[in-house]
UniProtKB/Swiss-Prot annotation:
Annotated coiled-coil segments of the chain: none
General function of this protein: May operate as a cation/H(+) antiporter.
InterPro entries per UniProt: Cation/H_exchanger_TM, CPA2_transporter, Na+/solute_symporter_sf
Family the entry assigns: Belongs to the monovalent cation:proton antiporter 2 (CPA2) transporter (TC 2.A.37) family. CHX (TC 2.A.37.4) subfamily.
GO CC terms of this entry: membrane
Keyword Membrane: yes
Pfam families to which the protein is assigned, alphabetical: CHX17_2nd, CHX17_C, Na_H_Exchanger
Membrane topology value: Multi-pass membrane protein
Record organism: Arabidopsis thaliana
Gene it is expressed from: CHX9
Localization in the cell: Membrane
Keyword field: Antiport, Ion transport, Membrane, Potassium, Potassium transport, Transmembrane, Transmembrane helix, Transport
One GO MF term: antiporter activity
UniProt name for this protein: Cation/H(+) antiporter 9
Keyword Transport: yes
Length: 800
């Protein structure tokens, strides 16, 4: 019996002589029960399965007890997982050492628990890859690249500059002098990189996944992770080439390239094929789910065989899964609860168990510079992330602080890197302990700071201009049109026909109209909301829903008639009423739309008479006006195209211009329509009878500039008219609006005119539809005799 075994109470574990001789880890799996040996019932823990069960029970007891207290102060469960591992570590219960002695003569006696822990990491990393917003990963703009490059390289260079500082003070008993720079390089490298699965987990935990801020964070993490991946591969290749064998180094890098190619050109198309073959609204066959999970596990095993970071395989497979239903959502629904609540906590606790606080305190003098280096890299990385956000990306200060804080967040993949470095002896046990405690504090403090700074009501705020007024020359006009009922289809298409101009497609100063049609269906009989894309491949598997078929046929016909100037993509969203505005905003963010067009909710009969108001649609519109990441247009349609042929009828479009950003946006939209030969555009500017000093008001100056530009553009056009009307007081405004409406088929007006000289307060008190603004409410009134449709425009709400 060894010294370590002599310290363990109870009988010796049931090893054979051969096992003792070779120090092997072969052991019996299941026992005969607790009564196998009545005098010493603990003998059952000499078997793998009962011991594993005891280990898991102890882990969850510690997690639950820790979280009972920590959750009261808002600390995430991830911290409780680490804390449970520290409680069960050498400084207190020393579970791993005890378990090792029960099964074998060396540490690998915990192979069963280690296996469960690694499986948990693989599964959780895979799910994070599945849940990652693929558009944020694959459609990366300049801002995330700048932030990621700055934070990665500035941190890496600054940290490595101090790598050899005070090496002469390192105690050879703590670590050989030649290994000390390697340990510091590990610290700097892991600090420099921001890992995509970790940030995905954080963004989902903070419920930021649908916000633009969350998308910036994920895109930035994707770039940083890619840079870290390349760095890791290069370092691994050079190290293996120099210190092991050139042949093995070449073999490992070729194996990695083969896996990436297989995932890109075989697995990813197969996953897309599964999605295409699954009928819309139907679940994916279970066999595909299990095959997908096994593929992720196999990819991880494959990489571990070739000396690569094993969880990378699971991440690559997860990123290859198409977003949302049916496959991605099914994987989340089936495996997320098991992995998140069972496997993942075990994985974190097992890695934390290897930390030895007592040893770290004993070696404090030797690791003190490592602690200083860790603090330095934290400050440098935060600064290197904050400055580009604020200066180059022009994000508001609060959002810049949030992004910089997110970039410093550390999580489960970082723990995995530390664990691998410890096993490869690139980290000492004392430094490993410091890094575990650092992640513990990091994961407890940073999310709390982010929660305090992040306002969920601002989740869809656009940090770049997404409106029609600021579109660049030759840019496509991206419009998201929303439909709640079949009655909304004709109005939406009639409006879009005015924006497209197939007869004047030789205009080189404008792009095409990129239309995204979203059919919103109130959720009934479904547990989870679902977004279904429609494309050519989905025609054979359409939902048996006549409304959706009608929508698709109508928009398909519209695209065929305007194929030179228009593209159309269609979606159906099954959603709860209170989440419809979020579905609209999410799709608008994904497609970078300039304007969302929604129906007003007021229904008119075929002969133009008022029928009813839909309260649900009005509530959705009110929320959308507050949340939208781009401009919004609310269409009150009364059938201006009735009795008119599409090819030769003239549509009289009027714009009432009072002033302000909403009116300027309405004018920009009308300018697009003016290029259609079927449109006769009239701009009516309302002026106050009072004399004003316009030179002191910036908005007045901008209004004049926009109007002058419009008049110059259409100075020679036969289909453009401009007039000015002087109105004094609310009654005069109402009368003039009603008279103007009689001469037009469609009126386009801005929503907000609060800062302007026209006295509209009296009219505001009598509004029936506040979401349309004062002028829009007048034009949508039940009492208005003129059969005119109205589009009320609100420009993108930007916040500094």
């Amino acid at each position: 019996m060894t010294d370590s075994q002599a310290l363990v109470p109870g009988p010796s574990p049931p090893h054979s002589k051969a096992e003792i001789c070779y120090g092997a880890t072969f052991f019996n799996i299941s026992s005969y029960g607790i009564m196998e040996k009545y005098e010493t019932p603990t003998v059952i823990f000499g078997y793998a399965l009962p011991l594993l069960e005891l280990q898991i029970i102890l882990i969850f007891v510690c997690i639950v007890l820790s979280h009972m207290f920590l959750r009261r102060i808002g600390i995430p469960r991830f911290v409780s997982n680490i804390l449970a591992g520290l409680i069960l570590g050498p400084q207190l219960l020393d579970l791993l050492e005890y378990s090792s002695d029960r099964l074998s003569l060396d540490i690998p006696g915990n192979v069963a628990l280690e296996g469960v822990a690694r499986l948990g990491l693989v599964m959780f990393t895979f799910l994070m890859g599945v849940k990652t917003n693929k558009r944020a990963v694959y459609q990366i703009g300049k801002r995330p690249i700048v932030i990621a490059v700055s934070s990665f390289f500035v941190t890496m260079i600054s940290g490595l500059a101090f790598r050899n500082f005070r090496l002469d003070k390192v105690d050879p008993l703590y670590m050989p002098l030649r290994l000390a720079p390697t340990e510091r390089s590990v610290i700097v490298s892991i600090q420099a990189v921001t890992l995509l699965p970790v940030i995905t987990h954080l963004v989902y935990e903070l419920k930021m996944s649908n916000s633009e801020l969350g998308r910036i964070a994920i895109s930035t993490a994707a770039v940083s992770d890619f840079l870290g991946f390349l760095t890791l591969v290069c370092i691994s290749y050079v190290g293996t080439y120099r210190y092991v064998s050139p042949g093995i180094a070449n073999r490992d890098i070729v194996a990695l390239i083969i896996l990436v190619l297989v995932i890109l050109f075989i697995f990813k198309p197969m996953a897309q094929r599964i999605v295409d073959m699954t009928p819309e609204g139907k679940p994916v066959p279970k066999v595909y789910l299990y095959v997908t999970i096994l593929t992720a596990i196999a990819a991880s095993i494959y990489l571990s065989v070739f000396n690569q970071m094993y969880i990378l395989g699971a991440l690559l497979v997860g990123l290859a899964i198409p977003d949302g239903p049916p496959l991605g959502s099914a994987l989340e629904a089936r495996f997320e609860s098991l992995v998140t609540n069972i496997f993942f906590p075990i994985s974190i606790a097992v890695m934390a168990m290897k930390a030895d606080v007592v040893r770290a305190l004993y070696s404090f003098d030797d690791i003190s510079f490592n602690i200083l280096l860790l603090g330095l890299t934290v400050v440098v990385k935060w600064t290197a992330s904050f400055v580009p956000c604020l200066i180059f990306c022009e994000l508001p200060t609060r959002e810049s602080v949030i992004i910089a804080t997110i970039m410093n967040y550390k999580g489960f993949v970082d723990l995995c890197f530390f664990d691998v470095a410890l096993r490869r002896r690139n980290l000492s046990r004392a430094t490993y302990t410091v890094m575990i405690i650092y992640v513990l504090l990091n994961a407890g403090i940073l999310p709390t700071i982010i929660k305090a700074l992040y306002d969920p009501k601002r989740k869809y705020i656009g940090y770049v201009k997404r409106d029609i007024m600021h579109l660049k020359t030759n840019s496509d006009l991206k419009i998201l049109t929303c439909l709640h009922k079949p009655d909304n289809i004709s109005g939406a298409i009639s409006l879009l026909e005015l924006l497209s101009s197939p007869l004047n497609n030789d205009n080189k100063d404008r792009g095409v109209i990129a239309v995204t049609a979203l059919h919103l269906v109130k959720l009934a009989g479904r547990t989870f909301p679902i977004l279904i894309p429609h494309d050519k491949r989905s025609k054979a598997r359409l939902l048996q829903n006549s409304y959706i078929q009608t929508m698709m046929l109508a928009f398909t016909e519209f695209q065929q008639e305007n194929w030179e100037s228009t593209t159309v993509s269609s979606f159906t969203a099954y959603s709860h009423e209170n989440l419809m505005d979020q579905d609209i905003c999410n799709l608008a963010l994904d497609h970078l739309t300039s304007m969302i067009i929604v129906p007003s909710g007021r229904k008119w009969s075929p002969d133009g008479e008022y029928e009813s108001d839909d309260i649900m649609i009005r509530r959705v519109n009110e929320s959308l006006l507050d949340l939208a990441p781009c401009s919004v247009g609310i269409l009150n349609y009364r059938g201006y195209n009735k009795g008119k042929k599409k090819t030769n009828s003239i549509i009289n479009v009027g714009v009432i211009f009072i002033g302000g950003k909403d009116d300027r946006e309405a004018l920009s939209l009308a300018k697009w329509m003016g290029q259609n030969s079927r449109v006769c555009l009239t701009v009516i500017r309302f002026l106050s009878g009072q004399e004003l000093d316009k030179s002191k008001n910036w908005d007045y100056l901008v209004d004049d500039e926009v109007l002058n530009d419009l008049k110059a553009t259409y100075s020679l056009a036969n289909n453009f008219n401009y007039m000015e009307k002087v109105v004094n007081g609310g009654p005069a405004v109402a009368t003039t609006v009603r008279l103007v409406a009689e001469d037009h088929d469609l009126m386009i007006v801005g929503r907000d005119h609060e800062d302007y000289s026209l006295d509209l307060t009296g009219l505001a008190q009598w509004m029936e539809l506040p979401e349309l603004g004062v002028i829009g409410d007048l034009l949508a009134s039940k009492d208005l005799r003129a059969r005119v449709s109205v589009l009320v425009v609100q420009q993108q709400q930007q916040h500094g």
